[in-house]
Amino acid sequence: MRINPTTSGPGVSTLEKKNLGRIAQIIGPVLDVAFPPGKMPNIYNALVVKGRDTVGQPINVTCEVQQLLGNNRVRAVAMSATDGLMRGMEVIDTGAPLSVPVGGATLGRIFNVLGEPVDNLGPVDTRTTSPIHRSAPAFIQLDTKLSIFETGIKVVDLLAPYRRGGKIGLFGGAGVGKTVLIMELINNIAKAHGGVSVFGGVGERTREGNDLYMEMKESGVINEQNIAESKVALVYGQMNEPPGARMRVGLTALTMAEYFRDVNEQDVLLFIDNIFRFVQAGSEVSALLGRMPSAVGYQPTLSTEMGSLQERITSTKEGSITSIQAVYVPADDLTDPAPATTFAHLDATTVLSRGLAAKGIYPAVDPLDSTSTMLQPRIVGEEHYETAQRVKQTSQRYKELQDIIAILGLDELSEEDRLTVARARKIERFLSQPFFVAEVFTGSPGKYVGLAETIRGFQLILSGELDGLPEQAFYLVGNIDEATAKAMNLEVESKLKK
């Protein structure tokens, strides 16, 4: 889908200064603004309040029109704090929705919801901007081919493959490797697909956003020496921001991603952390606007809001946006309207397991809980499907036998079960892999493993050809040839010790 970005920088055009309104009422982040008859702004238009507060400090607040109230009044939601605003202040109708900078100049930079850089690195070197409100691509523009998005991460590509232009839910608590997995995906899409990434921090902790930025600089995903070489643009709307900003920051990130897809014709990864906070912010805004709440107190427009965001994330004939969304499940209740509405849009789920992380198996992706609609013989092929199913069956059998092993020991198992356990332990270790972005911490060089190599490796383990190799040979290696080489090295080392 082609877009026609404007070539003017963000700001208030002199033409629209003729359309001035005045603040009639302020209730927290909500403003009622009166305009002259016949000069009413449209829904989603950006309004700008400029002036000075009582102590002479400059004020510059951007709002978005949400309702037309009648009597020449509109109700708008502020995108920043409304401290210092007073009734009677002048409000400028910009005559257009919020527009944010787009293009290569956004890479390596941090933006707020308005597209303003907040990283103290000066202004963004682009005059190309794009409005955050746009319709989804028309059906005729969509790329309807079902194709796998290869990540180079064995456990993902084999057991829960991502769809090109699909949406993936990332489930995981604190400290199980979510950030490192996100950074590896950003790194791999840049190297293998020539693509870029956009990270939308929606209602996350400021500390987490800062940690992510620092880790990206450390791992080379953001190149401090040459910003243009960076692989990701960051857009943050933190927990302390007003609900209007948290509700729109996802759209700002998506708009930047759409430009890379439609104009640069690239494959783009869009990360949203956390999609639940997007719903939560919408719920707050809905209550502030006086709408009647729906199920569990959520906004009545929940499905519409979620759909308008998710439908824009798709593959077109030009390129693709593949979205990975962290999903917080309130009180672990999957039937809560927020996660339930999100699930309807997901093509795959990647579940991170604390148990695997405790064993030191990274990425700690749970092979049994992670799912994908792409894992079908007609899409991935019989060979891939059969291998994935056998890996899952072996892992499931090992899980069932663990209680017996804990109570009676391994010797009490049948010969067949002992063989299953040995292969399952090799599979578990072979699902781990060294990451490029973790090289600085582990000292092991990262590995990108192609899908064909991944399938071949697991087939060799399942066939019994590698039963004689020690299980530690399969830990943190790339393809199966590295595992056999590691086994030979271990054998040589043990002989030398003797």
UniProtKB/Swiss-Prot annotation:
- Which reaction is recorded as catalysed by this protein? ATP + H2O + 4 H(+)(in) = ADP + phosphate + 5 H(+)(out)
Q: Does the keyword Transport apply?
A: yes
Please give the PROSITE patterns that the UniProt record associates with this protein: ATPASE_ALPHA_BETA (PS00152)
Subcellular location, record wording? Plastid, Chloroplast thylakoid membrane
Q: Which domain of life is it from?
A: Eukaryota
Query: What cellular component GO annotations does this protein have?
Result: chloroplast thylakoid membrane; mitochondrion; proton-transporting ATP synthase complex
Q: How does it sit in the membrane?
A: Peripheral membrane protein
What top-level class of enzyme does the UniProt entry assign?
Answer: translocase
GO MF annotation, one: proton-transporting ATP synthase activity, rotational mechanism
Q: Give the keywords, sorted.
A: ATP synthesis, ATP-binding, CF(1), Chloroplast, Hydrogen ion transport, Ion transport, Membrane, Nucleotide-binding, Plastid, Thylakoid, Translocase, Transport
Q: Does the keyword Nuclease apply?
A: no
Q: Which GO terms describe its biological process?
A: proton motive force-driven mitochondrial ATP synthesis
Q: Which residues bind ATP?
A: G172, G173, A174, G175, V176, G177, K178, T179
Q: Gene3D superfamilies under this entry?
A: 2.40.10.170, Bovine Mitochondrial F1-atpase, Atp Synthase Beta Chain, Chain D, domain 3, P-loop containing nucleotide triphosphate hydrolases
Q: What is its EC number?
A: 7.1.2.2
Q: Whom does it interact with, and what assembly results?
A: F-type ATPases have 2 components, CF(1) - the catalytic core - and CF(0) - the membrane proton channel. CF(1) has five subunits: alpha(3), beta(3), gamma(1), delta(1), epsilon(1). CF(0) has four main subunits: a(1), b(1), b'(1) and c(9-12).
What is the recorded function of this protein according to its Swiss-Prot or TrEMBL entry? Produces ATP from ADP in the presence of a proton gradient across the membrane. The catalytic sites are hosted primarily by the beta subunits.
Q: Family membership, please give it.
A: Belongs to the ATPase alpha/beta chains family.
The protein depicted here goes by the name: ATP synthase subunit beta, chloroplastic
The organism named in the record is: Magnolia tripetala (Umbrella-tree)
